[in-house]
Each structure stands twice: as structure tokens, then as C-alpha cells.
Amino acid sequence: MRYFVYNHHDFWQWEDSNSELMDSEVVFMWSDWPFRNEVKTLQSMGKKVIVYEHGFGALFDYELNNRDFIADGYLALGDESKESLIRAGVEPRKILVTGNPIYDDIKKSKHTGNEALYVALHWVRDVRYYNQTVFEQLKGAYPQFNWTVKLMEKTGKMVANKKWISNSDGNILEEIKDRLPEYDAVFTPRPSTFESIARLMGIPVYVVDQEQSYKDDGEPELMPLNNTYLKIGEKLPRQKKINMDEYIKRPSLSLDLILDWTKTL
């Protein structure tokens, strides 16, 4: 079967496209509602459009933010994403729980040292002051840690002795898997795909802004999760239990099985 892939932040981890867009029978996209006209055009040409979950919790967007579902089918990371889509109104037959190969080989290990990583907020607007303020508060409250700041191109500059800087257009997920085991605790205002990898590795994740004070009115709601929230200055709490098997299927399905499923739509 001929298929074409729109990759996004390297999250499509199956085989690359085996045809050009115009020759394809199936088109895998990272979302549909922002590209309504393109999706409709592709469907009018007889192509099936399939949306894959392009980050941890991404498919919750339909339920939480009332997005239109236009694609022919959806590939969910786990059962929780599938159930969210069903609550949003997507027919169960149009949802396949696939996992993602990027998660398949992650193993849990012990992390008892003092290397801490602050994963700074990367946002569509300038949040440099917010990031720097939170980082300074963390350093002051928890001096027992050696601190590193995790930055991306959308984060903006920060003042820190140690930085880990990534480019979302590069092979960012493999980079995260390679380097993240160096750290013993992760602190962030907003958990995302990065923190899902940390949790699978057994690294404690502390969410430092339960009130989401960085958000402006009208900005999208985020996926609900049993996060371990930390009020900066208080003793580090015990990690709350999250059954990651409910959110990420492992091992992931093969592309052959996914393509066979598209024939049923």
C-alpha cells in the first residue's frame, strides 16, 4: 500500500513514506483540524487521511478543546487517548491503539543522585521571564541538586551554568532517550512528551505550577494526569502513581498492521 507521511518533531517513528503525496493511498498527518481544507481535498481524491498522536496526550485536544475531527482514522498512543477520542465523539472503529516505536526500548532504572533538570517552558509567546524566575526559585529552594536547564528554540535564552539545548527539527527524541538517564529528577511547569519518557525511565517528575499561571485566557486546556505537583520551597513529595501502560501501548504495532487496519475504514 502506498502511503505518505507528514512528520512532526520526529514523532513518526515507523518507516518513512514509500510514495509521493499525489501517488499515495493513505496520508498520515499529525493533525487534521488546522488543515481542514487540505484534508478535505485529499479525501476528495480518494485518499484516506489518518492522524497519528504526535506527542504524549496530543489526542486529548479534541475532547478538551472541542476540536473538529475530520480525518478518516486516528492512531492513539494508548487506551486513555482512545477513550478521550470516544468521549469527543469519534467512532471507536476509527481509532487504533498503536503505541509508538520511540517508546518500545525504554527501560526503567534507579535514579538516586543529585543531578536535576529544569525543563523550561517552550511556548508560542515570550516566556523567558517566567522560565528564569521559576529556575531561580528552584535553585534557591533545592541547593542539594546540580542544576541543568533544558532549552529548545522556542524557549528563548536563559541564564544558567549548565544547559542542554535541543532543536525540534533534529532527531530530538533519540537525543532525549540518550541523555535523559544522566539525570535523577525532572522539574517542569508543564509536562509533555519529554516527561513521559522520564517516567518510563523511572525518573521522578515534579510539576511546579499546578495553577498553570503561564497560560493566557483562551489558551488550550491540557491533558489531565495524576502529576506530582510541587509547591516550590516545600519538601519534595513522593511520586504519585501513574500507570503508563494505560497511556502508551508497548510494544507498538507494526506499520503493516496499521496499513491493514486502514483498509477497514
Annotate each PLM feature.
Residues 1-106, 172-182, 193-196, 200:
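Active-site and donor-binding regions of nucleotide-sugar-utilizing enzymes
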Residues 4-5, 103-161:
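Conserved catalytic-core segment of nucleotide-activated headgroup transferases in glycan assembly
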Residues 67, 108-118, 222, 239-240:
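Short, surface-exposed amphipathic charged segments that create phosphate/polyanion-binding patches used
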Residues 92, 193-254:
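Catalytic binding pocket for nucleotide-activated donors in carbohydrate/polymer assembly enzymes
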Residues 157-174:
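Nucleotide-activated donor-binding/catalytic signature segment of Leloir-type glycosyltransferases, i.e.
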Residues 185-186, 204:
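Hydrophobic acceptor-binding patch used for acceptor engagement in glycosyltransferases
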